[in-house]
Amino acid sequence: RNGTHKFPGFYSFSTVEHGKRREIDALPIRERAIHKCLCNNLLEEIYARSFIYDNGAGQAGKGMDFCLRRLKKHLRDHYRRYGLDGGIYQFDFASYFSSLPHDEIKRRARMKIMDDRLYALFCQIVDDFQNMRTADKEAERKRGVPLGSEIGQMVALDFATPIDHYIKDVRRIHGYGRYMDDGYVISHS
């Protein structure tokens, strides 16, 4: 109401997924409602415009099933054109969520969020990410977004979008897909 927002902190816990330990910084329900409102009413619309079709994470109507269907299509298309010639390259951006720099997140958001009050709220939320358990080293405190935040998910999706466009639009590689920080490239050379 008056342009101020007080962040209550994170609930931090660990989980093991596919044999990999993940540190989760989850938001309290009230804070999650603020993030959801900002995502649903602003960020999804302005960020999703720049996503490639073959990015399946965090978008309505997409997800893991969509990515699997696209991978199968890319494999069939490659086989029809090149047979067994070529290869599949998988990638996973190491420490992706914990390495995203806050200054760059805010710089990129400024180009998309025109309303000064909404941009200020967005920046305050990004600054609040410095309180995550996963950002416990002083040098790293201005890096990282939580896995448990919709805003963190949207920012993480956006951050690798220039790579997506380079591979799809500049290199013209049809067999490329990404789900958050994981992806593949199918190439004949």
Task: Describe each model-derived feature in a short phrase.
Residues 14-16, 25-30, 77-82:
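Short, charge-rich binding segments
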Residues 7-8, 55, 113-114:
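P-loop NTPase nucleotide-binding core
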Residues 74-180, 184-188:
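Conserved polymerase palm-domain catalytic core
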Residues 39-91, 95-98:
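Active-site-proximal segment of RNA-dependent polymerases
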Residues 2-20, 119-136:
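Reverse-transcriptase-like RNA-dependent polymerase core
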Residues 21-52, 141-169:
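Conserved pre-motif C helix in the palm subdomain of viral-like polymerases
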Residues 7-10, 29, 33, 37, ...:
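Generic alpha-helix structural propensity
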